[in-house]
Amino acid sequence: STLLGSLLQVLKFNLDRKAERVRVFELGRVFLRDASVKSSDTTVEGFHQPMRVAGLAYGAAQPLQWGSKEQGVDFFDVKGDVEALLAPLQAQFEPAEHPAMHPGRCARVRVAGREIGYVGELHPRWRQSWDLQQAPVLFELELDAVLQRPVPGFRPVAKHQSVQRDLA
């Protein structure tokens, strides 16, 4: 399963209420068949349930401004969002195929050689079935990979100021 369907429902809900620019994200579990998973208090037999983070951008890339023309959100806007989310880790993007995404406008996201998700434009067939004026750009990443990024640590402020003197 995937979180992308839920994001499209939220998008449609907002568009039906005349929202022209939509940016949403979601955290949740997806369900993948895996015969090696045994039943326990936190698992269901035969299903792996990893946490994922997904996001969607639709409409203008920037709010309306008098000095510039309105430009729709594109793949590179959301790719930049994914890079910012993963920073300081260096993500690599390579062309890929995903059933929900446009062929030729989809990329696999890798961090340290490990595939962690996808980013791309919604497939034209799904765009048509959801009756969308333009294609939203979506991403879905493994939450564990996002949480592995190093976070800057706290360093207390020195109690005494440093002193520098020129003794010459």
Model-derived features: positions:
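Extended beta-strand-rich architecture
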Residues: 1-168
